[in-house]
Amino acid sequence: MTWLAAFRAARWRPLILGLMASLFFAVTFVANEVVSRTGGSWAWNAPLRYFLTLPVLFAYVAWKGRVGALFQSFRRDFWRWTAYGTVGFGLFYAPLCLANAYGPAWLVAGVWQVTIVCGVVLTPWLSAPGPDGRRARIPARELVTSLGIVAGAMLMEMADASQMSWRRAALCAVSLLVAATAYPAGNRLAMRAYAGAFDPLERMLGMTLGSLPFWIAWSSASTALVGWPTLRQIFGALLVAVCSGVIATALFFRATDMARQSPSELAAVEATQAGEVVFALVLEFAVIPGDRVGWLGAVGLATVVVGLLVHGLAMAARPVSSEGGE
């Protein structure tokens, strides 16, 4: 059996894809911080990412010959696609960029891990009812492990967060809470409605199209308030669009698609986003000079890694789900 065949058969394949996604997602935090430090406004980071992602996704869907089917669905379910795109992309990324303007990349990436708990807690409301008509319950074991991962991420933040003013800290926290709730909500609702009809990249194009009214209004306001984006900011947004908007989101959507039949596996996959803290810290160390985390941060980092390992071992011990065994 080749390594590729072994990977395809692995029970923990969704977890690996989730971790790969977290690496590319980490680029977002670092790139946005670099742009903020070089004078670019955070208000343009969000719409530029999705404007630049749109042609890439369209080219992929056109290459597959699926544009007609997607557009037909978009016309039929315009308001549904608009709602999913606005929540999953608009109310996720705009607050995230605001938070990124008030703290270093690794700090924002760490606090962002509250999305893991949000995803688990939202399970009963965002999962499809079972054959008996009952909705899935909150997976208790995965919730405990996810809370442990978030606790580790919080330890990494304590030293740096103490240097922020209460106003900045509160604004950052509220922005991240909105983003952390909107992202799993939009993703799961769209996955529940269209996972059988469209693959992850096709679904991303539909959600991106649905988010355009939000981004057009947002960019119009940004132009009036801060002017046009700089050329350097456009290049930074292009990097984010490719790494995070296409590669990372496609990997993450694929991982959640594979685990969608099991609330426990889905919770474990969403917990892989904690890897963003580690990757953001490494990337920030490589490209941005500044203070680093001390021993408390190291303890938090170890806690995050242990939590991810617990999720991985739990998934490896389960039977392969109908999606995960593809």
Identify the meaning behind each predicted range.
Residues 2-7, 53-74, 150-166, 211-233, ...:
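Membrane-interface helix-cap regions at the ends of transmembrane helices
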Residues 3-4, 50, 266-326:
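C-terminal-most transmembrane helix of multi-pass membrane proteins
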Residues 22, 48, 107-114, 190-211, ...:
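Helix-helix packing/entry segments at the starts of transmembrane helices
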Residues 57, 124, 137-160, 294-315:
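Hydrophobic transmembrane alpha-helices of multi-pass small-molecule transport proteins
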